Amino acid sequence: MRQRLFVDRGVLVAYLALTLAACRAAPGALVPVGAAPVSREQVGEWVAATVPTEHRLHRFKWLFQDERSSAGGRGSARIAPPDSLRFDVAGPFGSGAASAAVIGDQPLWAEPPDAVKKLVPNYPLMWAMFGVARFPEPGDSLRGLTDGRVIAWQYAGATDTVAYVRTGGKDGKLTAEVRHAGKLVGRAETTLDASGAPVKARLVVPSVPAKLDLTFLSTARATFAPDIWTARRP
């Protein structure tokens, strides 16, 4: 049976403000300890609300920074619901070009082979930067809560924990956090427009430390040729 776990809105909004502030400082838990167990059906509804219903083409500027250097340029991402993504990025004058096609949390191909890992350490974090949450794995323990406008939910597996907070409205946000064996892998915060399309996104990876910023230039419906999912041949 579907569960709707409502909490006092003021409490949840205050909690969310503190949590998102933690994205910029010492990160705390994204989902409150008091969140209750929820059904896969309920989580499925929350996730489905983030998945585009049509093919989308995103164009964006990107900037990657760590303690040693920084690099940036422009890129595009083609998303075919429910879970297929092709991205292409390059620096000035085509330098450092990289491409990859992904289905869910598995790469079909990547050029160069480490194209995804060099920028994003985890596929749920990658998807979150485009405003899309991922479904839980079989056997995950699920918790969540909502006040109708703010939704927070978490999947806990044997070693990994994935958590999301989503807010609606004109300037909505999707925040995602991934932990491995309790250690923070990364946290992504994406600002959304009223239609749910991404406006800007930031990924913070504390272990490097590093951050990746995306500034979206456009989001549009698109028709994709079948060969975009096939790796280019030499």
Locations of the language-model features?
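N-terminal beta-strand/beta-hairpin edge segment
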Residues: 61-67, 71-106
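Acidic/charged, solvent-exposed loop-and-adjacent secondary-structure segments enriched in E/D, K/R, S/T
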Residues: 107-140
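Gly/Pro-enriched, hydrophobic low-complexity segments
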Residues: 144-234
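Residue-level recognition of conserved beta-strand positions in structured domain cores
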Residues: 89-91, 111, 178, 203
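N-terminal leader/targeting segments and the immediate start of mature chains
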Residues: 23-72, 76, 80, 119, ...
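Sec-dependent bacterial lipoprotein signal peptides
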Residues: 1-23
